[in-house]
Amino acid sequence: MKGPFPAVIQQYVSNPKLFDNTKRKFDLRIYVVVFDMEPLTAYIYNEGLVRCCSKDYQAPNVENCKIPHIHLTNSKINPSNSSSSSIEANTQNTNNKKATPAVEWENQVLVDIDDDTINGTLSSIELNKENSNNTTAVDEQSNKFLLTSWLEKPGNVESTSDFWKQVHDSVAATLLAIQPTCALMYNTCFPLSDRRENNVCRSFQTLGFDFIPDADNKLWLLEVNNNPSLNLDTRIDHKIKLPLLENIFNILSQT
């Protein structure tokens, strides 16, 4: 797109799935860690963030298209909206039940992306992880929620296996698309012969894949963030990001 600055035009998802018992649009942040580009070596973390808008969804029109709290799920935008706390109240009041208890970290794995993954078969590496502190699946200080807790609620997805297959297929296709260019740049900095001789990982990159689910449970890749925030702004951030970093360095210690 020509203009005063580079821009990308995306088709707006006109039938977004709305969060649980609320009328809020949301997205899903999935973390992917790339350790090598030749051969392509990457992992998907199977815990993530559900990030909600803080105003009820409305189909875009001339009047509301400039109201970010309706259409943009970015967590940096929505905490500034004073109505954000209502999501947490609506979530906990559904069927007069409390939020889903926090999951145990020993069940979390990083899933390896390899040729089998592209064909729909997943391989995983179990790593040692400590139990998290008593953190609920809902953070009342923000519009963030645990992905696994959302997946466990009936009706949110047709099946978790189908959900993760969509994620894996999208991540694999994205990484394969950028692999030739990234491999060239990577090999310029770290010659392949040197890497094989020393058998070490020279670098890694954490990516944030953001998906918008629609009303038919199809995942749409919104963007890939090459520098996702690892700030620990909320309790949910502590619960997700600290084990993620622990897993990354555990894998690095094995390479």
Indicate where each model-derived feature is located.
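Catalytic core of tubulin tyrosine ligase-like
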Residues: 1-206, 215-216, 234, 238-254
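A short beta-strand motif that forms the metal-chelation/ATP-contact edge
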Residues: 211-213, 219-226
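Glycine-rich phosphate/pyrophosphate-binding beta-alpha loops
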Residues: 225-233
